[in-house]
A protein has these predicted regions:
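Residue-level detector of the transmembrane beta-barrel scaffold of outer-membrane proteins
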Residues: 51, 65-67, 103-107, 158-162, ...
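Outer-membrane beta-barrel domain signature
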Residues: 71, 75-78, 83-84, 102, ...
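Outer-membrane beta-barrel signature, preferentially recognizing the C-terminal barrel domain
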Residues: 125-159
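Outer-membrane beta-barrel pore domains and translocons
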Residues: 57, 69-73, 86-88, 107-111, ...
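C-terminal outer-membrane beta-barrel translocator/porin domains of Gram-negative envelope proteins
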Residues: 40, 100-108, 113-121, 128-137, ...
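Transmembrane beta-barrel architecture of outer membranes
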Residues: 47-51, 78-84, 99-103, 142-146, ...
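Outer-membrane beta-barrel initiation region
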Residues: 1-73, 79-81, 87-96, 118-119, ...
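Strand-connecting loop/turn motifs
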Residues: 61-63, 99-101, 154-156, 220, ...
Length: 287
């Protein structure tokens, strides 16, 4: 009953959930705006970056979901954007990531990113990721077009099949130069690839949030196996390549002494490729 208290609750809920609902109790939200922590950020290429994002919920359609964002950098004066449509063969209660997944997704993205942004567990535009231990000036304008199918089973096996076309244009302190006497500047790299990945985590359970789903218990072992093949001459792809990766995670408890989380990962790039297609460490220069 306190004046203005509902606005305090609204703001707190937006920051805790990281999304703003557009509905009411009587008319549940069909579109959520967010993540809130990506609306303002900063990086070497964009400078000040403003972004508006939104995603639909099962209140609009329990099978068909849309997600996207538009961002603008005030330093490079370029627009960045992403659009995604996902069809879930399972009826969802609120969001498509709810376990178990059985869906097909088409996405289109044009954005600026560093080579290691793909390893981040959070959104790369998270405002807290803007604070880094050193300047990250080696970045790329990346255009990705992807079609992905994901299937999860009750016994913990996840299968992912994906085809993707990527265009990588270096910018900032990053440049692609041929490794020969000519030292020719390469304006961009195009790849066309298909991948197959398996993830097996018996006994794993999740809690769903509006931004991601979080494992309830980290005691379940996780086994991963993936292979990606690149096709030269297909839809502009410039390189043949084969990348195989395997991984293992397991938590070990030592009574009252604590625990040890073990991560083991290995991979092989079987072809001669430019350095952006080589295996790289999962570096994160943010605090």
């Amino acid at each position: 009953q306190m004046p203005g208290f509902k606005y305090v609750i609204f703001v707190l809920k937006a920051f805790i959930e990281n999304f703003v609902e557009t509905g009411t109790k009587d008319n549940p939200s069909k579109v959520d705006i967010g993540p809130v922590n990506t609306m303002i950020s900063n990086n070497y290429i964009d400078g000040l970056r403003l972004r508006m994002s939104a995603q639909t919920t099962a209140n609009l359609n329990p099978h068909l979901f849309f997600k996207g964002y538009y961002a603008y950098g005030f330093k490079d004066h370029r627009s960045k954007y992403m659009g995604e449509v996902e069809y879930s063969f399972n009826k969802k209660e609120y969001l498509p990531r709810e376990f178990p997944k059985n869906s097909i997704t088409f996405s289109y993205q044009y954005d600026v990113m560093s080579p290691t942004d793909k390893f981040l567990k959070t959104d790369k535009d998270n405002v807290f990721v803007s604070f880094k231990t050193s300047t990250v000036d080696q970045m790329s304008y990346v255009r990705n077009i992807a079609l992905k199918y994901e299937n999860e089973t009750q016994f913990g096996l996840k299968t992912t099949v994906e085809v993707k076309h990527s265009t990588d244009e270096p910018t900032g302190g990053l440049a692609y130069i041929t490794n020969d006497d000519q030292k020719t500047l390469v304006p961009e790299i195009q790849t066309m690839e298909a991948s197959l990945a398996f993830r097996y985590a018996p006994g794993e359970t999740f809690v769903n949030t509006k931004q991601r789903r979080i494992p309830v218990s980290f005691d379940a072992p996780v086994f991963t196996l993936s292979h990606t093949t690149g096709f030269k001459g297909v839809l502009g792809g410039e390189y043949n390549f084969n990348l195989t990766e395997v991984g293992l995670y397991k938590r070990f408890w030592f009574s009252s002494w604590g625990k040890i989380d073990m991560f083991v990962k290995g991979g092989a790039q079987w072809n001669k490729v430019p350095f952006p297609l080589l295996i790289m460490p999962a570096a994160n220069l943010s605090y």
